[in-house]
Amino acid sequence: MTICVATGIVTSRAKKVSEMEREAEREKIHSNLLRAVSHDIRTPLTGIVGATNVLLEQDGELTQEQRQQLLRSTNEDAQWLIRIVENLLSITRIHNSEEARVKKAPEAAEEVIGSAVAKTQKHYPDVEVHVSVPHELMMVPMDPLLIEQVLVNLMENAVIHGGTSRIDVTLSQQGGDAVFTVADNGRGIPLHLLNKLFDGAARSDRSSDGKRSMGIGLSVCRTVVLAHGGTIRGENKKDGGACFTVTLPMKGDDDED
């Protein structure tokens, strides 16, 4: 009896320590996200204000080409803000749920990939996206909107920060996990960022427009994947470019013993 009680106490303490560690990690991610958001929101807003001020104050002196350029710049910054908001909504959806978990239901992974690819190609029509999926439909327990956002973030990151012209999205099953990979032929991940890609603080000075942070998007990816009980990692390919791998358990929470 004494041994059982002692074992129960140790187990209870271990659970509390593990819970405290998870909470500390969530707080760290949350803090880093706030810093990244404050930077990333300010940048496009400054661009929008600057462009519209020029249009309002110097409209009579501008050529048609200059006006079009200012309008394009404003539109791009507005689209950027929309994507930031989409990511913030994803994070809020998780943090507002109990224990930072998500409600999962079996979804066709191929359809989620297809939706993410369509959204990405709408924004970046010049980038080739090649998809490889199994012949048989893979039903994976997930929140489809959140996993779609993960895939969109990874593909967008490849374009903005990797400068890629081609993206390969692959779906496979390894043991009890569904494995999604997003690989590109771009510049790869800067070595000094490899160990902090997902903590919300990662910033690359090699983005296509020279100002966008990769911190928010990848941090959102990590938060979403962990809330699904999965894993995510990023690495450089030997032949150039980067590869991100996401694994999600094929077994739902209700199936666990």
Task: Map each language-model feature to its residues.
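Short alpha-helical segment of the dimerization/phosphotransfer core of two-component systems
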Residues: 76-82
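Short helix-loop "hinge" at the ATP-lid/N-box region of the Bergerat-fold HATPase_c
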Residues: 158-159
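Short helix N-cap motif at coil->helix boundaries in the Bergerat
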Residues: 109, 188-196
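Conserved micro-motifs of the catalytic ATP-binding
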Residues: 96-102, 139-142
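Conserved catalytic submotifs in the C-terminal HATPase_c
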Residues: 103-106, 128-138
